[in-house]
Swiss-Prot record:
Name assigned to this protein: Asparagine--tRNA ligase
Assembly, per entry: Homodimer.
The encoding gene: asnS
Family statement drawn from the similarity comment of this UniProt entry: Belongs to the class-II aminoacyl-tRNA synthetase family.
Alphabetical list of NCBIfam families matching this protein: asnS, PRK03932.1
E.C. number: 6.1.1.22
Keyword Transferase: no
Gene Ontology biological process terms, A to Z: asparaginyl-tRNA aminoacylation
Length: 467
């Protein structure tokens, strides 16, 4: 086979030099035709769109052609010509074909519809489908948008540890990391497990958040962001939870809660616009196939300012809805940690646009959030989105050493684990704020997928760590 430089299909479909000899490589989606001519739909993953390969059967070995089945990988040299059919401007008239990889007849991705549940069972193959090709190209583009946004605003990308000795959320739902023999655990004089001989000499876990370390960096570099995997051992089998997911966590010195809200709104609008501008074909495919209102919803986020609403006012709206006959599964009262149904009511039915809820009761928020003067609420914020509920959680951080100490004691967090964090309040403390965005929550919104397991390549959930 003549050596010709490969052209990606995404680039080929934009070319206008009709008559050029080209090489394309990819996987066969379908093959159809007559006794004289076959048409192969070829895809290489660079785009949702296939290129049609026109094969004059008289010019090729019959035994080789039998190997070209759905899923097979082939290389084609041919002439780029104007397409006589609808759907795309160009196609390739094959001159040479090489089968790079045959596909066994047990290949599960034949030309028919497959349920999302079935595709999760073959997560190693599902990126080859149109749906997951689109989702994972969008995932890549969202990652690019995140780095681009913060870089353009002068933030520094800061790497926080995956293995940690602290629990940022105070939730205790952490995966432990140990090299100890689990069948012969050493106990101390109180009967508790002794970690003296463990690798780190202390109890260690996979991180639930890089926020605390990010705060340290912000008090030195001014503005930083983290973007990496986080882990939570929540035994939650829901369409909204993963045990392993990715978080984006900016921290900014000298920002108050209002600045934090401005940054969150600007950031998420930037990401949504990036998807519409740079993933148009993939977004349109998902809109047409899964969620007819997807594009309209994405455009709506860009059009309207987010509502900024104190928690207390939000509770009043929900209580009024109940009084008028609206049924919620979970009760509504001041002090409750709002359920997804409450958040979505505010966004989808009352305001019909994203909402930033602020000034939550301190009892339902983390120790590091700055207290308001009323002594009952903290300067927290949650960004609520249609179909998703909470997509961002953040706050102005408590900068006062004594107030932070008191809050740590109230929540019974071991002081020995917090000395390094408290040092930043002793040595040149400053106002600062930040937030966390679950990357997969953002992807749920941008792709229109209904289950968070379908926006990450290999979901980690209770009883599931395959691949």
């Amino acid at each position: 086979m003549e050596k010709i430089g490969r052209t990606k299909i995404v680039d080929l479909l934009k070319r206008e030099d009709i008559g050029a000899m080209v090489n394309v490589k990819g996987w066969v989606r379908t093959r159809r035709g007559s006794k004289q001519v076959n048409f192969i739909a070829l895809n290489d993953g660079s785009t949702i769109n296939n290129v049609q390969i026109v094969v004059d059967l008289a010019n090729f070995d019959e035994e080789m052609l039998k190997l070209i089945t759905t899923g097979a990988c082939i290389s084609v040299n041919g002439v780029m010509v104007e397409s006589v059919g609808s759907g795309q401007k160009v196609e390739v008239q094959a001159k040479e074909i090489e089968v790079l990889g045959t596909c066994d007849n047990t290949y599960p991705l034949q030309k028919k519809g497959h349920s999302m549940e079935f595709l999760r069972e073959i997560a190693h193959l599902r990126p080859r489908t149109n749906t997951f090709g689109a989702v994972f190209r969008i995932r890549h583009n969202m990652a690019i948008a995140i780095h681009k946004f913060f870089h353009e605003k002068g933030f520094f990308y800061f790497h926080t540890p995956i293995i940690t000795g602290s629990d940022c959320e105070g939730a205790g739902q952490m995966f432990q990391v140990t090299t100890m023999n689990l069948y012969d655990l050493k106990k101390d004089e109180r009967g508790s497990i002794s970690y003296d001989d463990d690798f780190f000499g202390k109890q260690a876990s996979l991180t639930v958040s890089g926020q605390l370390e990010g705060e340290l960096a912000a008090t030195a570099l001014g503005a930083i962001y983290t973007f990496g995997p986080t882990f939570r051992a929540e035994n939650s089998n829901t369409p909204r939870h993963l045990a392993e997911f990715w978080m984006i966590e900016p921290e900014v010195a000298f920002n108050d809660i209002a600045d934090n809200m401005d940054l969150a709104e600007e950031f998420i609008k930037y990401c949504v616009k990036w998807a519409l501008d740079n993933c148009a074909d993939d977004v349109k495919f998902l809109n047409d196939m899964f969620d007819k209102g997807l594009i309209e919803r994405l455009q709506g986020v860009l059009k309207d300012d987010f509502v900024r609403l104190p928690y207390t006012d939000g509770i009043k709206i929900l209580e009024d809805a109940v009084a008028k006959g609206h049924k919620f599964e979970f009760p509504v009262y001041w002090g409750v940690d709002l359920a997804s149904e409450h958040e979505r009511y505010l966004v989808e039915e009352h305001f019909k646009r994203p909402v930033i809820l602020t000034d939550y009761p301190k009892e339902i928020k983390a120790f590091y959030m700055k207290q308001n003067e009323d002594g009952k609420t903290v300067r927290a914020m949650d960004v609520l989105f249609p179909k998703i509920g909470e997509i961002i959680g953040g706050s102005e951080r408590e900068a006062d050493y004594n107030k932070l100490m008191t809050r740590i004691e109230e929540m019974h967090i071991p002081m020995k684990d917090m000395w390094w964090y408290l040092d930043t309040r002793k040595f040149g403390t400053c106002p600062h704020s930040g937030f966390g965005l679950g990357f997969e929550r953002l992807l749920l919104f941008v792709t229109g997928m209904s289950n968070i397991r379908d926006v990450i390549p290999f979901p980690r959930t209770p009883r599931n760590a395959d691949f």
